[in-house]
Amino acid sequence: MHPLPDGVAIGAHAARNLVAAGLDVVAVVKQGDFPLADVLEQEGCNVTMFADSVRGMGASLAHGVAQRRSADGWIIALADMPRIRSSTIALIAKELTAGRDLVAPAYKGQRGHPVGLGKRFGAQLAALGGDAGARDIVAANQSELLLIECDDPGVLHDIDRREDLAPPAADDRA
């Protein structure tokens, strides 16, 4: 896990923001990745190791959902998006609690992450496989998607390359 400029690992930042939003966070970790599991547990996550992570993000997501089958909904968040504000995550959780089935944040009109899916999508989430994750579920139900416009550029900022590690511009700080 690569650190951000402040020295804290990317995934630890993402986990910290989820926990700070008041969520029961389940983190799915590749079987045997004990260093990552330890970091996430220290941040307050409930860690579950998944032996079949080679089956793709969808299978990992299904494994995580299976850990909380009775939940009223799930917020699908990624470890490579550490700059999403906990207040944004809490807004998504609030809409799920109020009965919304599909919720996502938007920044300047552009849909971001994480995406919240209500209980009605539980069976579909539990059946996922491959690398598409929940993308197909969201696409098939686009007309039901509630976009919450928020002043949080972090919802669009994932860290895929070394250049992405630099702090955002002053007017885009998350």
Regions found by a protein language model. Give the residues of each.
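Nucleotide and nucleotide-moiety/phosphate-recognizing core
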Residues: 1-111, 119, 143-150
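Conserved alpha/beta core of the MobA/IspD/sugar-nucleotide pyrophosphorylase nucleotidyltransferase superfamily
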Residues: 123-174
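Short glycine- and hydrophobic/aromatic-rich loop-to-beta-strand nucleating segment
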Residues: 113-117, 157-160
